[in-house]
Structure formats: structure tokens, C-alpha cells
Amino acid sequence: MLPTLKKSGRPRDARGRFIRHHERLPVSLADTRGALFVASEMADFIKAGGLGDVAAALPRALRHRYDVRVLIPGYRAVLERAGKVEIVGRVLAHAALPACDIGRIVQSDGLPIYILLSKELFERDGSPYVSTSGSEFEDNAIRFATLSHAAAQIAAGHAGLGWKPRLLHLNDWPCALAAGYVRWSGGTTPCLLTIHNLAYQGLVPYSMAAALGIPAERVAELEFYGQMSFLRGGIVNADHVNTVSVSYAKQITGPAQGCGLDRLLAGRAAKGALTGIVNGIDASWDPRTDEYLDSHFSVNQWQGRQANAAQVRKAFGLRESTGPLFAVVSRLVHQKGLDLICEVAPQIVAAGGQIAVIGGGEPEIERQVAELTRRYPGQVGAFIGFEEGLARRMFAGADFLLMPSRFEPCGLSQMYAQRFGCLPIAHATGGLIDTVDDGVTGFLFQHASVEALRRCLERAFRTFRLPSLLSAMRRAAMLRPSGWDVAGKKYLSLYEHTAATAPALATVS
């Protein structure tokens, strides 16, 4: 049984940890402007990726200027943590999309959350998107079209809530079709679509168009190489599209990272309707107070890092060492460049370094990592899986974070590492370009190749042997602004821009 969210006290995330947002400003809704933030996951209740963290943090960062409310599906984990849910509205059936009640809870910090209730669609085991066996739910198209349609109905004032948003903020493919449902019904509510990862597009066969309630004359808006793409439909119909970093917004307009949508996105960019905003990270990532650390430290007091490094070495079965400790906190998949790490591991060990790996993913890469631990006992250690406290201690104790991702829309690990004084060694792509200042707050290499990574590692080893330079870089990394207050201000401006430049504003009640 998963824990129930308490009615009082600070809100907790899906793992039961306190959500702490030191940058959250006092809530004043005298100048109220409504925004509905629609997401398929939220770390308060359930999380499958970085979107869950954003959905928990960004609405809270905006509430001093907007009446932001969140809409999420009523997964089993959500209902178990939500406590008592008040039924406040209902959306009607549409084509094959079932009617659903809308529940409402208010988090202890005052954030209102609407929950789309459907036992048939959402109350099941597994993650938001896949079953316990790891396969996608066969009815995902119906599930998330229902979420999208509900958002459009709320925007139109047809859900009985007594409230209409001035703007819809949609996130990734599961919510993208809401922009289409708004437009296809003649609605004018401004829609902002945030793309967290363009690689996931919500592809479904054309044969489902009628079941999803897509007008026959608008099906072409979703066309993607013989299928329909929820994400493409959102990009076409949203008033503005943004991504989670400035560099990623530029990269997806080209064929290398455009995932087949580059021409469409380039067209939106040419009209000023595609921008990028780097994500923030939660205030709980603070080495002075982190609840998972036994030894705290700060930019002016480093001793705690040594104690954390010793804990990490012990946890991973590594020998005591005065050499650099390299951390890998990642899904073990090709996209994250884990094959490159496996190739350079012998060089790291030969130069006196050690490697600690935490994560899970593709069986072949897991096998390669396991082989490295057998080949270099005491120098390479791995934990296949994930454990939050251990990951945080790795950031707090390691000298360098290996992050050679082939593409990275934003990335959070590099910012977590920087906050804890662990210097990222990263491929210059997407959000890594925007968050790692080469030679100042970490190290970047330009090509996702073994040779480029090797040369970057040589720079890192040279820096490690210069204590004054290493300390200066750690300090710069720890002091880099990365909280949600920075991103929140940019989203507030984007909300205003989207509302002001939409062809016609909805009548706000």
C-alpha cells in the first residue's frame, strides 16, 4: 500500500519526500489570471521522468502571478495519495472517449489539483504509460485523448467547475491533442505546448481518427508518415511551442534532432512561435540541508564532500583512493551515451580514477557495466536500479559526473551535480550546452565519440591535479543559478506573450 498524502504539513512527492521550494513567493491572487497546467504525471503523486518534477515545481513557481491549477489523470497511485477527493465537475463523452468525473484536492501549500477520474482508463498497475511488464498500454490513445479532451472542455467552461483558464499549458504528447480539441470546437483559449522530449510523439493509426473524435477534415494536421501523431497535432494547433532548453529549441528545427518534425518546427520558429526555457531544479537539492546526506557541506566548507565520497566508495565496493571519483547517474541506454562510458572506462581506471554507476536500462548495456565491475574490482562499482538517497550521495561525493548523452532536451542530473559541487563532463547538446559553462562549471565535448570523450577526460584529470582550479570550478558550479525562480519568471513572460499574441482571446469568466 502506497502512503496517503497527509492533509496538513508540507506536500510530499511520489517517494514520500518533502517538496521544498524556497523560491516560491507568497500567493496573491488579487490580480487573478487563470492557467490550467495539464500533465500526465506529477511528482507529488507519480513520476516516470523529468516531466513529473516540472509538473510539481513550475505551477508552484507561478502562483504569485497566476491562478495556476493542475489537471492530471486519476491513476491508482494518485488516488491513494490524494486522500479525500471532492467531485466538482464532469466532462461528457466524445466519440469513443468516455465521460469522466473531475475531482479536486488542494495541496497543503494551496495548489489546486483537478483529477480526471476514470476507473476504466487510469486505475491500474504500472507507470502512467506502461504496464508492470514494461509494455505500453494498448489503449493509451484513448486514455490520453480523454485527458486532452477534458482540458479542452474545462477551457470552454463546459465541465461545471465555475472556472475557466485564461490559458492552457500542455505538456508533451499525452496532452498535446487538447490544442486541437480547442480549435476544432471553435474555441479560442490560448494554448502553450511544452515539448520535454520530441522523440515521444504519441503515434496512432489513422483508423482511430473517428474514435478519437478528430474531424475528418482535420486529420491531415496529425499526419506523420502514414500514422497520426498527437504531438504533431499539438504543434500545429498550439499558439506557441516551447522546449525545455534554448539549444534544444534550435536543434529540433534541423533533421538531426527534429525526429521528422523539423520542417514543421522550423516554420513555427520562423514565425516566432518556438522558444526554449531551461528547467529549474527543486530547492531540496541543497548540500547544506539535504535530508539524504549524513555529512553536509557548502561552498565555504568542503569537508562534508570527503565524507560523502567515502560513503559512496563503501556502498559500491570501491577501494580507498585519493584519485578522482566519477559518477554515472543515468538510464543505461544508448541515448545517454553509456556505450561511450564503457569504452573509456579502462582509460579512467588506468589513470587512477574510479567509477560508480547507478541506473537501469537496456540489457546489453547492463551486461557491459556488470562486466566492467568484474574486470576492475574495487575500481568500478554498479547498482542496477535506482535509489534516491544513494544517487544524492553520489552527487555529493563524486568529483565528476559522466553525461555523454547523444541528445538531451534539458537534463537535470548535470544541475543536481553542479549544486553539489560535482563537475559534469557532458556532450555539448541540448540543455547541456545551456547549463554547463565549459571550463567554468564543468566540461563539454563537441562530438558524441569515444575520442572526443577521451580528450575531455584528460582535461578533467588535469584539473583534478590542480586543487585551486578544481575548487574554483566547484564553487562556480554550486553558485550557478538553477532554481525555479529563474525559469518561473521566463514562463510568466511566455504566458503573457502567448495570451497576447493568440489570434483571439477567450472570454474569461
Curated annotation (Swiss-Prot):
<comment type="function">
    <text>Synthesizes alpha-1,4-glucan chains using ADP-glucose.</text>
</comment>
<comment type="similarity">
    <text>Belongs to the glycosyltransferase 1 family. Bacterial/plant glycogen synthase subfamily.</text>
</comment>
<dbReference type="GO" id="GO:0004373">
    <property type="term" value="F:alpha-1,4-glucan glucosyltransferase (UDP-glucose donor) activity"/>
</dbReference>
<dbReference type="InterPro" id="IPR013534">
    <property type="entry name" value="Starch_synth_cat_dom"/>
</dbReference>
<dbReference type="GO" id="GO:0009011">
    <property type="term" value="F:alpha-1,4-glucan glucosyltransferase (ADP-glucose donor) activity"/>
</dbReference>
<dbReference type="InterPro" id="IPR011835">
    <property type="entry name" value="GS/SS"/>
</dbReference>
<feature type="binding site">
    <location>
        <position position="47"/>
    </location>
    <ligand>
        <name>ADP-alpha-D-glucose</name>
    </ligand>
</feature>
<keyword id="KW-0320">Glycogen biosynthesis</keyword>
<keyword id="KW-0328">Glycosyltransferase</keyword>
<dbReference type="Pfam" id="PF00534">
    <property type="entry name" value="Glycos_transf_1"/>
</dbReference>
<dbReference type="Pfam" id="PF08323">
    <property type="entry name" value="Glyco_transf_5"/>
</dbReference>
<dbReference type="GO" id="GO:0005978">
    <property type="term" value="P:glycogen biosynthetic process"/>
</dbReference>
<dbReference type="InterPro" id="IPR001296">
    <property type="entry name" value="Glyco_trans_1"/>
</dbReference>
<keyword id="KW-0808">Transferase</keyword>
<comment type="pathway">
    <text>Glycan biosynthesis; glycogen biosynthesis.</text>
</comment>
<protein>
    <recommendedName>
        <fullName>Glycogen synthase</fullName>
        <ecNumber>2.4.1.21</ecNumber>
    </recommendedName>
</protein>
